[in-house]
């Protein structure tokens, strides 16, 4: 699964995922403001990149559209640790993937089951399921 779908900027909530400047991000803060009698409501989003820890901001009319990344959460088994990468076998399709080793996930070793997700043709390990 890859790509994005359009969504309403005014309906985005904290914890949801959006695409800002081509980067898939998790929304950390939203602010709605109505500037005046004749202006439309504005929405300000503060988000952090999923794959790189970059902070992104987006301001736009509440009625405008924003891209929502299609995220596919899956389970896999760690086959091997290869330096800065982890080789994972998907538990449903049995395909093997090389995913960068995450800094924030503890307990990754050969044979454990992990949860990972794919968004915009990139992969990230989110947590260890079983040891």
From Swiss-Prot:
<dbReference type="GO" id="GO:0043022">
    <property type="term" value="F:ribosome binding"/>
</dbReference>
<keyword id="KW-0396">Initiation factor</keyword>
<dbReference type="InterPro" id="IPR019769">
    <property type="entry name" value="Trans_elong_IF5A_hypusine_site"/>
</dbReference>
<dbReference type="InterPro" id="IPR022847">
    <property type="entry name" value="Transl_elong_IF5A_arc"/>
</dbReference>
<dbReference type="InterPro" id="IPR001884">
    <property type="entry name" value="IF5A-like"/>
</dbReference>
<keyword id="KW-0385">Hypusine</keyword>
<dbReference type="GO" id="GO:0045901">
    <property type="term" value="P:positive regulation of translational elongation"/>
</dbReference>
<dbReference type="InterPro" id="IPR008991">
    <property type="entry name" value="Translation_prot_SH3-like_sf"/>
</dbReference>
<dbReference type="GO" id="GO:0005737">
    <property type="term" value="C:cytoplasm"/>
</dbReference>
<dbReference type="Pfam" id="PF21485">
    <property type="entry name" value="IF5A-like_N"/>
</dbReference>
<dbReference type="InterPro" id="IPR048670">
    <property type="entry name" value="IF5A-like_N"/>
</dbReference>
<dbReference type="GO" id="GO:0003746">
    <property type="term" value="F:translation elongation factor activity"/>
</dbReference>
<comment type="similarity">
    <text>Belongs to the eIF-5A family.</text>
</comment>
<keyword id="KW-0648">Protein biosynthesis</keyword>
<dbReference type="InterPro" id="IPR020189">
    <property type="entry name" value="Transl_elong_IF5A_C"/>
</dbReference>
<dbReference type="InterPro" id="IPR012340">
    <property type="entry name" value="NA-bd_OB-fold"/>
</dbReference>
<dbReference type="InterPro" id="IPR014722">
    <property type="entry name" value="Rib_uL2_dom2"/>
</dbReference>
<comment type="function">
    <text>Functions by promoting the formation of the first peptide bond.</text>
</comment>
<keyword id="KW-0963">Cytoplasm</keyword>
<dbReference type="GO" id="GO:0045905">
    <property type="term" value="P:positive regulation of translational termination"/>
</dbReference>
<dbReference type="GO" id="GO:0003743">
    <property type="term" value="F:translation initiation factor activity"/>
</dbReference>
<protein>
    <recommendedName>
        <fullName>Translation initiation factor 5A</fullName>
    </recommendedName>
</protein>
<dbReference type="GO" id="GO:0003723">
    <property type="term" value="F:RNA binding"/>
</dbReference>
<feature type="modified residue" description="Hypusine">
    <location>
        <position position="37"/>
    </location>
</feature>
């Amino acid at each position: 699964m890859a790509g994005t779908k359009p969504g309403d900027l005014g309906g985005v909530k904290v914890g949801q995922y959006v695409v800002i400047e081509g980067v898939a991000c998790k929304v950390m803060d939203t602010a709605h403001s109505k500037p005046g009698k004749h202006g439309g409501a504005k929405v300000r989003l503060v988000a952090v990149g999923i794959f790189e820890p970059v902070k992104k901001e987006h301001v736009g009319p509440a009625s405008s559209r924003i891209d929502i990344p299609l995220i596919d959460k899956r389970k896999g088994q760690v086959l091997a640790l290869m330096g800065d990468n982890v080789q994972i076998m998907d538990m449903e399709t049995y395909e093997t993937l090389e995913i960068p080793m995450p800094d924030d996930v503890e307990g990754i070793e050969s044979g454990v089951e992990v949860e990972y997700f794919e968004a915009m043709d990139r992969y990230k390990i989110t947590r260890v399921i079983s040891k």
